[in-house]
Regions:
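Flexible, surface-exposed loop/gating regions in the mature catalytic domains
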Residues: 38-332
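C-terminal motif of bacterial Sec signal peptides marking the signal peptidase cleavage site
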Residues: 15-18
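Bacterial N-terminal signal peptides that target proteins for export
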Residues: 1-9
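Bacterial signal peptide processing site
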Residues: 20-23
Length: 332
């Protein structure tokens, strides 16, 4: 006799399960309109910080960090610049004396210039070469630069003592590829030092001139804290002279950088053996970080890396392993 019990049992169980489901009404209730709306409400997006469209780098001279940051004698740096900017508390120079540090800012290495202030015409690749290849605009404004009007001046210093121009502080004139011809005449200019009658009021240096993507500003030796007051006389000199120069020019520089630009104020070197230097990052678009500090370790390769990242350029030498300076524009 054929046994059908298993088939019958399975059928009975399926029928019982169906009846149980129907009779008890156990099923997921449709979500309420409130639940549906809540589950599909998009989270607000937070705008990411953006790269600046203009970068201005102002380089001062020979000042250890603790003689700049918090120095009550430097009224403008302490009273205006620091509250408006991000202060980098662990920035260090890479070499000594001055010249190799300026090379490092543009090449991520000293290119064999360590220990020399006259090792011009370096042949290693530089930021300026990168920008020229991509057609990105750049200018170096050196205060007291004797060249111009189609001429390129490559002398070590200016012919007049009162000018206090020094080639060793002009980054692009330290490389053979950008210290002659059109690369020099088109990009290196005298800083338009438009002072008031008594030399004390803030000025508008560029008078609406459209700044390129990258601008270096190099004050002369009496305005960059390099020369002492006794060397500069009426030009004041020393750290007080540099603070006064910044008080006349800072507003113009930050304004001319535009609403999405940044100004990096840094020093070439500090003190032998330490090279701890001050650096401030400001500009119209950085007001959200004004008066704050960053304690991460940075150096001149970090400056180069930040510029390369902002301009979409590949890294050079030491910049490849460097932490970029925090120059991103915070979202509003």
């Amino acid at each position: 006799m054929t046994r059908r019990t298993p088939t019958l049992t399975i059928s009975v169980l399926l029928l019982a399960a169906a009846c149980s489901s129907t009779s008890t009404g156990v099923s997921a209730a449709p979500p309420s309109p409130t639940q549906t709306a809540a589950s599909h409400t998009p989270k607000p997006t937070v705008a990411a910080p953006t790269q600046p469209d203009k970068i201005v780098v102002v380089v001062m001279e020979n000042s250890p960090y603790d003689t700049i940051a918090g120095n009550p004698a430097l009224h403008f740096i302490g009273g205006t610049i620091a509250p408006q900017t991000l202060t980098l508390t662990q920035m260090h120079a890479d070499s000594a004396p001055s010249l190799p540090n300026y090379v490092w800012m543009a090449a991520g290495q000293s290119c064999g210039a360590d220990g020399s202030d006259t090792a011009f015409d370096r042949t290693c690749p530089s930021l300026f070469d990168q920008m020229d290849r991509k057609g990105i605009g750049w200018t170096v404004y050196a205060e007291g630069y004797p060249g111009g009007a189609g001429s390129c001046f490559t002398g070590v210093s200016s012919d007049t003592a009162s000018n206090d121009y020094a080639r060793k502080h002009v980054p692009s004139l330290l490389f053979s590829s950008t210290s002659a011809g059109a690369a020099c005449t088109s990009h290196v200019k005298n800083f338009p030092n438009d002072t008031s009658a008594d030399g004390s009021a803030p000025v508008n240096n560029f008078k609406g001139v459209h700044l390129p993507a990258l601008t270096f500003v190099i004050p002369n030796l009496c305005h960059d804290m390099h020369n002492s007051a006794s060397q500069c006389g009426a030009a004041q000199g020393g750290q007080a002279g540099g603070d006064l120069w910044l008080s006349r020019n800072w507003a113009s520089l930050t304004q001319d950088a535009g609403p999405h630009g940044v100004v990096i104020l840094t020093w070439d070197e500090g003190q032998p053996g330490s090279e701890h230097i001050a650096t401030f990052i400001g500009g119209a678009g950085t007001s959200a970080i004004g008066g704050t500090q960053d304690g991460h370790a940075y150096d001149h390769s970090s400056t180069l890396r930040a510029i390369e990242d902002a301009l979409g350029l590949p890294c050079l030498a030491g910049a490849c392993g460097a932490t970029p300076l925090p120059i991103l524009i915070p979202a509003n």
